[in-house]
Amino acid sequence: MVIVKSWQKIFTLLVVLLLCIGCSKVPSTSYNPWAVVSLPTEAKLLDIAFTENPQHGFLVGSSATLLETNDGGNNWQPLNLALDDDRYRFDSVSFAGKEGWIVGEPSLLLHTTDEGRSWSRIPLSEKLPGNPIAIQALGTDIAEMATDVGAIYKTTDGGKNWKAQVEAAVGVVRNLERSVDGKYVAVSAKGSFYSTWEAGQNAWVPHNRNSSRRVENMGFSQDGLWLLARGGQVQFSDPANPDEWLDAETPELATSWGLLDMAYRTPNEVWIGGGSGNLLVSTDGGKTWEKDRDVEEVAANFYKVVFLKPDQGFVIGDRGVLLKYQPEAAKTATTEPAA
């Protein structure tokens, strides 16, 4: 009798588990607008940028990886720079017209004024707080650089001189993001808090996380901030009250993979990259979600999503994985008549 009751309990638990998994499954997208791009490397890729020519771009990553495309990102060729060590980690690349910048670790800054045909190294002070991990080209001879402890510097003379924008660093960060209008948000190394900064402020403003879940990544939405937390949670700040947060959403409950990065393609369409080949999309600003299951077999964690323009986007994964957005596939899917 005891054995029968035990089996009944086990059976009931299995049924409940199966029902929960079934109910939590995110619906599939009706089409897949992403194509896997073959790359001549298995290095960890970290950033992508294009020159004023939308066909001409660069990918950067670990082990001094620098790849160049001249056909919009369909094909990439490796470039070797004359550096004293091939173990540099190229963290960030940015272009404004023909002028471009690359920053990396340890303490590396590269500059080009001819669309990347030649690169020169600009020495950085030994007193620089931390290593540069982010660079943003802002115009001719103008760029803004940030380090892994939240120090922010700006040059207006092509990198000859740099002026500190914030008086004190914020501490080691795991992620740092800059908005189009020059605001910053940084997540602490352990994800226990985040900080914000904007021009005119002397120091970073710290903020406690709003739940017990550690913060994975943060960035800027159309009218505030977005936040990805451990356990697959996504959250948006309240447009009416930027200091408050809307209720957290968990697009897929029964999952062990995390959400790693998010980017807007349009004001309403947003994509999230996650671990184990997971890619989610919302077409209503984050209210409901669908999963692109056509890329689930890609053996990579999708840790960076980039949309340079609505019709030009990329998903960067580990082990040399790159997905390219196919606007024609999306256009065809949205114009096909219903069956």
From Swiss-Prot:
Topology with respect to the bilayer: Lipid-anchor
Record bears the keyword Lipoprotein: yes
Gene3D superfamilies with a match to the protein in the record: YVTN repeat-like/Quinoprotein amine dehydrogenase (2.130.10.10)
Keyword Membrane: yes
Cellular location(s): Cellular thylakoid membrane
Signal peptide per UniProt: 1-22
Major subcellular site: membrane
Record HAMAP family: Ycf48
Similarity-based family: Belongs to the Ycf48 family.
Quaternary structure, from the entry: Part of early PSII assembly complexes which includes D1 (psbA) and PsbI; not found in mature PSII. Binds to the lumenal side of PSII complexes. Interacts with YidC.
Protein name: Photosystem II assembly lipoprotein Ycf48
Lineage summary: Bacteria, Bacillati, Cyanobacteriota, Cyanophyceae, Nostocales
